[in-house]
Each structure stands twice: as structure tokens, then as C-alpha cells.
Amino acid sequence: MVKIGLEIHGYINTEEKLFCSCKAIHGLKFAKSNTNICPICTAQPGAKPMLPNKVAVDKAIEIALILGCKINPKLIWQRKHYDWPDLPKGYQNTISGAHATPIGENGKFLDIKIKEAHIEEDPAAWNPKTGEIDYNRSGLPLIEIVTQPDFSSSQEVIDWIKQLIMTLSYIKALDKNAGIKADVNISLPELKGERVEIKNINSLTNIKNAIEYEIKRQKSGEVAKVQETRMFDEAKGITIKMRSKEQAEDYRFITEPDLPVIIFEKSRIEKLNSSLPETPQEKLKKLIKKYNIEKKSAEVLTKKLEIAEFFENIVDKVNPKLAVQWTTIELLRILNYAKKELDEVDIKEEHFIELLKLVENKKITELKAKEILNKFIPKSFSPTKEAEKHSKISSEDELESVCKQIIKENPNAVKDYKSGIKESLNFLIGKVMQKTSKRADFKTTREILERLLR
């Protein structure tokens, strides 16, 4: 049996760093090296930390709460000592270690027990090949989520992490530009070896590959005699030993004298807890049960909170089937094309409902409605006046007259259709749509053409 535990590291979504007022900007692609720094985050002599970023602490509490953790009301900052080029102070400020209680502990998320969730500061970015150290990252607030070793396969790990990321996106807890990293702990108790930790794996693909390689390596007889730390070589697809695993005493944890103890009032925790939305998993079950939606469509709706809430606000006011179709397909289509999130544009629910009612009442064709919807970005409008210019052809006699004209103008397509090339019918339908400025009903047009071509 394989036992796998995770330590997930994510950047908390804040505007400023944890102990200074420098902007929280992630990655060299967003800023030049060492331009977003100050004496505090570069550990200049005499520089003292500011009070911890309240937004970061509150976000950490929300993360712990949504993972079902018990919140500890008293938090004591620690100094975690180790020697590495990216750590200018020689220690990391964290709420973990021998003398600390984490922000949250003893939680559970999707049947996986959460040991703890705690907050800490990120070190700088060090490039061992060039020796360059970029302090833009130094001091960014990190959340670390530690699970019990409850996983038994790589796929189980990946599925769980995907659900975790989606859930935390509902509370906008993590910086979406920064991604996550994971330390993976693997042991095979039947082989009587020690636990192996694989550090700093930076993508779901690499996490999966690292786990599968490490299980295979240990089963082949390379069992660790002592706990050890390894790294994953992405290019070679293997894990490489870095060092023996450190124990807590190796980090020489001491209480941080420059930072005050954090005391959480009960009312503060209750307020944060009451502000939490339903989780994606809860919404999924609700949408399927309440609106009889297929699971696949419900999964699309619940990937993002703003889409799920948008749907819930319109579904009782229009045909539910139409609401599902136009939210999961057409709304997402225009957002993806514009490379925008729903909360980055101004699409009013009443305008969307109005458009769907025009379709439902056969005032306009779906093709014309899609054209109008395309114009809803960046800002929606009442579609009724626009629809009046392009009202649907209601007379079958009028539509039949257009179809006869198209048949007359396209003898080659007619000949192809009658010789068995059925795709030619779509060509003729397209010509009708073009002639009528998409005011013709697609289904009716097809039926009339098929009848006329018999």
C-alpha cells in the first residue's frame, strides 16, 4: 500500500507583501528584477518588519475555514532558521514549528484529513546557474496546507488538488497568476522504508510524474533507510536525492521578538466564516438536484463562482434548458474569445434574460441572438431594439419564396445534393441565412429546402 501526503504552497491574493508595503507582484515577467523591494524585504541591517498584512491573515483564516479546520485564536510568529542564498535574514518568519500553533488544524476536505494550514513569508528567487537573486518575491505571503498521508495514488492526488484550487478560487484566496507548488511525501510501509519528501514540484503534470516515478523507484528496491529529501528532474523524469530530511530541531525555531502575538476575536472568525460562499461541491449537488441539470453541464457552471451565481440568478426567469445552454456555451464563448472573466465585464443579468426571452418567444433566431450577445462585451444593453431590426421571418410563405430563389441561383449545389452529397444542403441553408441576414429559423429552413428538393 502506498501512503502519500501533501504540503501545498500557494501565494495569498494580496496587494502588498506580508511585512512591508511593497507590491505583491509575482514573477520576473511582471517586473524587472529587484525593483519591487525595500529595506525590510531585503533584510537590511536595522530594518524591522511592519505589522502583518491583515488581508493576508484574514485570507489564511478563510482558507482554513473552508477546509473545515479548527481556528486557533492565538498565533505566535516563529523564526525558522536555515542557510540558503535566497534567505537574506538567515531565517523565515512563519506560524509553524515547535513553539507555534497553526492558523487552522484538524480539518477535512473531500475525505482527506487536513493536518494544518499556516501562513509564512516567501524567500527570494535564486537562480543557481547564474547566481542571481531577485528580491521581488521576498516577503510575499504564502499559505501552506498540510494533509495527512491519506492518498494512495497519483491520480487521486491530482483530482484532489484540482478540486482544492477550484474551491479556493471561490474565495479569491490565491493569486491566479502565481500557481501552486507542492512537497510530496511518499512511503510504502510494507517495504519498511522511511518516508521520502519530494520538494517544490511546480505543476500538476510534474506532481503526477514525480509520484509515479518515486513509487516505481522504491518498489524496485531503492528503499530509503533514513528519511530523505529529493527533487524532481522534469527533463529526465526522475527524482534525485538532495539531502537527508531535516527534523524540526534542525531549523532552531525561536519565537519572533519583533512581531506581536496575534489574538483573534471570536467575532472576527464568525464574520469571516459567515462571508464564505457555498463550495463548488455543494453548488454542484444543488444545481443537479434543484434544476435537474446534467452533471456535465453542472460541472461547467460550478467551475467559477461568478458563472454559477449568474446562472442561479437567471434560471428561474427563463426556460431552464435555454439558461443552461446559453450560460455554459454562449456566455463562456464570448468571455473566452475576449479573454475576460465575467467580473471583468459589465453583462447585466436582466439584459441576458431579455435576450433569452426573445429567443424563447421566437422573436429572433438563435444565430441573430448570438450576434447580439457578441456585442455584450464590454457592456451589455437592452437587446429588444436591436432585435426589432432583425425580427425573425414569421411567414413560412415568405421563407419558402427565399428558399426557391436560392435553389434557382445554385443549380450545382442542387445537383450535388440530388446525387447524394448531403453536405450541399448546408451550403444552401447558409445561402438562405445570408439572404435573410440570419432572420430565418434554421430548423424551418432545413425542412422547407428538403421538401422542395425531393
Language model feature labels by segment:
Residues I269-S275, E312-V318, F352-I364:
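Extended, non-catalytic structural segments that build the interaction scaffolds
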